[in-house]
Amino acid sequence: MAKPRLLVLYFALIVVPAWVSSIVLTGTSEPPDAQTVAPAEDETLQNEADNQENVLSQLLGDYDKVKAMSEGSDCQCKCVVRPLGRDACQRINAGASRKEDFYTVETITSGSSCKCACVAPPSALNPCEGDFRLQKLREADSQDLKLSTIIDMLEGAFYGLDLLKLHSVTTKLVGRVDKLEEEVSKNLTKENEQIKEDMEEIRTEMNKRGKENCSENILDSMPDIRSALQRDAAAAYAHPEYEERFLQEETVSQQINSIELLQTRPLALPEVVKSQRPLQRQVHLRGRPASQPTVIRGITYYKAKVSEEENDIEEQQDEFFSGDNGVDLLIEDQLLRHNGLMTSVTRRPAATRQGHSTAVTSDLNARTAPWSSALPQPSTSDPSIANHASVGPTLQTTSVSPDPTRESVLQPSPQVPATTVAHTATQQPAAPAPPAVSPREALMEAMHTVPVPPTTVRTDSLGKDAPAGWGTTPASPTLSPEEEDDIRNVIGRCKDTLSTITGPTTQNTYGRNEGAWMKDPLAKDERIYVTNYYYGNTLVEFRNLENFKQGRWSNSYKLPYSWIGTGHVVYNGAFYYNRAFTRNIIKYDLKQRYVAAWAMLHDVAYEEATPWRWQGHSDVDFAVDENGLWLIYPALDDEGFSQEVIVLSKLNAADLSTQKETTWRTGLRRNFYGNCFVICGVLYAVDSYNQRNANISYAFDTHTNTQIVPRLLFENEYSYTTQIDYNPKDRLLYAWDNGHQVTYHVIFAY
């Protein structure tokens, strides 16, 4: 082993200095000759060559150190090694060894229960080991050694080569060479940059000299150019009043053009002459900076002004960005929000006007009388008229109604009260309801002579047993008891019968194989509610679909009673579900977190011992459509042969009561269908929940009391659908299919 090591060290000592010296020489801008090399550079190269042995010793020193390995707590180990020298190997080979020609390893330990071990490569301890093994291999042929002995010797020689040490030394040498190359490249880059700068300076100086020479030649060849230019300049500045006179003529021409333009407009009426400020303020409002935007919802039109009023252009430009501009237009915060039932118009009180304001106000009152009288007014004699409160500061005018018994007065209101509508329980004849009118359209109609017919709301009565109306929510206006079973004014009317259901769109993968996810159709936000599994007592809320995909829930509701099945719904801020193992249905208020209503289904055919497995559908299933809340459950047919039938009943969302007039017994049978849902008062049932290509094989129309077999294709993409619910707000079917949350688009036939 000693000979290969000596060869490697000798090669490194010879090659590396020559390589380094060649690199250093090539790094200069001009290669020096032998005579031009300074004595200082020769001394530096010689010192570097002499120090190569020290550098290699430093490279090998940290590797040749013996490593100490310790075991135990509070243990400190130290290894002291005394290796053999090269002369010791020679004495051992010559047979004249001494007592000190042995390497020793001493272990120094400190600490309780401490175990130390010293690890070192053989070449670091006994440099004679390589020579000894090489000699043995050479004598193997003459001594007829066994193959196993040769293998042992080869293995020892292989380990004695100490390839790890060679690799470490090579890596460090390569690192040093890389550093040298990096430094040389930096020096070359700096020198190149310096050369470029010198070249730029030389080029700039040459250009300057060339221009100076050219200018001198031009001046020499054309001596009269400078004098001619001086004469022209003197002529141009000889009359200083010329520029002022030109500007004055331009201003006069602009004034003449503006006067001619204004004279072409027709003159206005005499009573409109003094109205100047409102027009200026409206124009100034349009010129506000972009940092204070104003949304204009209404425009007041005035007749043309005389030419004298239009000449005040400079005054308008001076006040263009002033803060004294009055606001006489409708802005977004003052508008009454259109909820689909009522229409109102509000205006800010105008500034004090003279002459013209009185005429316009009287004319506006005279023209808006039919329109104002059409608004519903509070009256004890006719309870079908609705009480409507205006919003924001309004124009205090009293309109003259054609009917003296119904007088309409618009009063200012500082706050926005809740809009309520009162109706009678019995139907009364009413005119057909025209389409809703926006505030801007109503204002424009009020300024014309054509009156708008009165708007009335027609509702259907359910009889004397109609329950109380729902509470108001931020997402929908308060409805009367007759209108609580028909929310088409809030969500939208049905377009027609169901035509097609598109393929499923996977929105998320969440939870277990069974579960339900739903949205509140009457909510203003996009919150998603999830019940994981078909039994439990926790309802999880997500802020929107994106948070649901990320698994970031925003709220959790611990229900006082457990639910069973997947037929729950969230409707008008409440969670409706079937209490586990009972005939009870519960309405849980999500905002107040309490049980708002409780009811028992006396005729439900409930299985007392429900097996702990999914049967393909829920025994009690809630549904929501454009008409409100529905309940689907199995019951015994009292009129027939006491068979179980599926009952569809319109459910009162306030107290969970049902009525016989709105309860239908369908032709469905339990355990013969998968999932069902209601769209526009029609019950649809899917024939299978665990087949990929299923069909909507049953439909019952509550409007005509007829049932058909539509045979519409319904795809269970993951072949395990445990919930299908219709949302009338976005007209989508929400389904839970084997742990995947999917949606279906509903297409209607026109």
UniProtKB/Swiss-Prot annotation:
Assigned keywords, A-Z: Coiled coil, Disulfide bond, Glycoprotein, Secreted, Signal
Localization: Secreted
Region of interest (Disordered), ranges: 346-437, 452-484
Coiled-coil region: 40-68, 179-213
GO molecular function, a single term: extracellular matrix binding
Predominant location category: secreted
Position of the signal peptide: 1-22
Glycosylation sites: N187, N213, N695
Residue stretches of biased makeup (Low complexity): 416-430
Stretches with biased composition (Polar residues): 354-384, 393-413
Entry keyword annotation includes Coiled coil: yes
Domain Olfactomedin-like: 493-750
PANTHER family the UniProt entry points to: OLFACTOMEDIN-LIKE PROTEIN 2B, OLFACTOMEDIN-RELATED
Protein known as: Olfactomedin-like protein 2B
Organism: Homo sapiens
